[in-house]
């Protein structure tokens, strides 16, 4: 499969223009590292995060790199686990007004209240999988040969996700508490990027996690690892964080 996708990408990249130079900010924080613990029992994917498994996962809180954005600074916490079948990611999002309009697979969920993970196995340069998931539980998945064009038609079979909302969706007249999301990403999703995608203890992958919150013009992007870009943009793999797989 890697050979097939390599041939496809060669043809794909040959017909798209080069990317513009991306302006970066200075004095950036060090790239973070996260130890992904092995789950003894796989969490239920129901969006509620009440499984005992999540208690063994270290929480990380997203930062707000762009002070000029006018949206509320609402807290996002993420946790990761793994086993021989899947990578598990959980997000908890404080949100006073949960909004999600898009309902179909591969809709532009990033325009809603949404969370994301971008991820690639070791040895892969500027090529990663993207999963962007809104508060409804709608998935936009793709392969991104950065900095070219996102391959929107590339799908990840077997991904399971669910959300839970504390409040009412798309009702700005009341006060919500927030929403949470769980996703299980099969290691088989990475079979085009790695011959043996199931990690071993000590393996290091690259990833970033993000949240889009609010509606235009009051919208804000928060991140685990600051992309360092001048304008709010999560896509910059040189600034992805490191995932280390541990017991």
Go through each PLM region and give its residues:
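Structural preference for beta-rich elements and adjacent junctions enriched in aromatics
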Residues: 22-247
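Positively charged n-region of N-terminal signal peptides that target proteins for export
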Residues: 1-4
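Sec-dependent N-terminal signal peptides of Gram-negative exported proteins
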Residues: 15-23
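Bacterial N-terminal signal peptides
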Residues: 6-16
């Amino acid at each position: 499969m890697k050979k097939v996708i390599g041939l496809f990408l060669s043809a794909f990249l040959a017909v798209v223009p080069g990317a513009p130079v991306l302006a970066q900010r200075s004095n950036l924080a060090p790239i973070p590292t996260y130890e992904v613990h092995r789950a003894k029992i796989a969490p239920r994917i129901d969006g509620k995060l009440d499984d005992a498994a999540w208690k063994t996962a270290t929480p990380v809180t997203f930062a707000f790199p762009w002070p000029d954005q006018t949206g509320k600074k609402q807290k996002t916490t993420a946790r990761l686990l793994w086993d021989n079948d899947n990578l598990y990611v959980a997000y908890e999002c404080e949100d006073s007004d949960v909004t999600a309009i898009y309902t179909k697979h591969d809709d532009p969920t990033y325009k809603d209240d949404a969370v994301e993970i971008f991820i690639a196995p070791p040895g892969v340069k500027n090529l990663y999988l993207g999963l962007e998931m809104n508060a409804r539980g709608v998935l936009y998945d793709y392969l991104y040969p950065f900095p070219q064009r996102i391959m929107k038609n590339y799908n990840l079979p077997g991904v399971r996700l669910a959300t839970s909302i504390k409040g009412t969706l798309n009702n700005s007249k009341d006060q919500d508490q927030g929403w949470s999301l769980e996703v299980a990403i099969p290691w088989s999703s990475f079979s085009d990027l790695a011959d043996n995608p199931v990690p071993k203890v000590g393996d290091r992958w690259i990833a970033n996690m993000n949240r889009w919150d609010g509606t235009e013009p009051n919208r804000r992007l928060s991140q685990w690892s600051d992309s360092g870009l001048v304008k709010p943009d999560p896509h910059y793999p040189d600034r992805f964080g490191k995932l280390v797989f541990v017991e």
